[in-house]
Amino acid sequence: MRFDLEPPSSVAAAHRIGVLLINLGTPDAPTPRAVRRYLAEFLSDPRVVEIPQAIWQVLLRTVILPLRGRASAKKYAAVWMPEGSPLRVYTERQTEGVRHLLAANDYQVQVDYAMRYGSPNIAQALAQFKRAGVERVLLMPMYPQYSASTTATAFDAAFAALTRMRNQPEVRTVRHYADHPAYIHALAEQVRHYWAQHGRPDFAAGDKLVLSFHGVPKRTLDLGDPYHDQCQQTGALLMAALGLSTLECRVTFQSRFGKAEWLQPYTAPTLRELGEAGVRRADVFCPGFTADCLETIEEIGMEVRDEFLAGGGQAFHRIPCLNGASAWIGALGEIVAENLQGWPAKAAQPETVS
């Protein structure tokens, strides 16, 4: 096996620490070609689609990519920001926020981000850490709830990159933070901030808050994936923080792909049913998405909104994701700091003479 070329080892670099924030990924441009390239990588991951690859690749290349590439490109174009993809823009802002927060608290660490699919990829980010002399790495997925199709595959990619290194860094992973008090606080603050600006739903009159998480096939729950339970846990803690009951707030799952049964209840049908039942206002918040992206801006903000209004609803509100909110940056910094304990991450304090 050939190993990657590496700089000479340096004892002076032995205490350098890197924190890598990992998100899902995004096409490089809202064009059919770029979207097809991104989807080909994403949907070829056996952690994402658990179908024998010999069968799946034929279907993917001959049917799915040709059909979905152009349609998905139109959706990406509808949400694209002047600075680029929303997911990349917000992830970059989060990275910069955590970097500044840790530096302000005397942490001497390098903070960067990578995408599981697309660029910059995880192997590239780890190689950049290596060139900078980093010998300890904290992998921090931007997925609060653990799932094999998100968290595990991000770790897979990182460990695959390590197999090509002669001089591997020490590695720690953050498995999940679905119930972390700082994360729950940041979620509650995001909802409260939105309501302070746009008015609080009239729950006494029947208005609803819907917490929409990304869906996964139901069989993954039956096979032992903890994702569903952690989503429910996050939802319950957020409801408690907001002082809401299950009559006022409910958990749903979105982004179903294919014909197999996924985690239920599904978001879009739920919103249509609420509209048909006479619910006047529905607010939708996506706690599992730490940055706004196609699934939150287009799917929730446009498609799900239309379902609710078509059902008879009158007022639909999509509450933005955590993005660069100060409470979320603080929560990220707190979670990272907890997982850096035991490593020489902080600047040495000068001794005082009494």
From Swiss-Prot:
Superkingdom field: Bacteria
InterPro entries in the record: Ferrochelatase, Ferrochelatase_AS, Ferrochelatase_C, Ferrochelatase_N
Keywords for the protein's UniProt record, in alphabetical order: Cytoplasm, Heme biosynthesis, Iron, Lyase, Metal-binding, Porphyrin biosynthesis
Gene3D superfamilies named among the record's database cross-references: 3.40.50.1400
MF GO annotations: ferrochelatase activity; metal ion binding
Gene Ontology annotations for the cellular component aspect, listed alphabetically: cytoplasm
Predominant place of localization: cytoplasm
Pathway: Porphyrin-containing compound metabolism; protoheme biosynthesis; protoheme from protoporphyrin-IX: step 1/1
Catalytic activity reported: heme b + 2 H(+) = protoporphyrin IX + Fe(2+)
Binding site for Fe cation: 214, 295
EC id: 4.98.1.1
Free-text function comment from the UniProt entry: Catalyzes the ferrous insertion into protoporphyrin IX.
Family per similarity comment: Belongs to the ferrochelatase family.
Official protein name in the record: Ferrochelatase
Organism: Burkholderia vietnamiensis (strain G4 / LMG 22486)
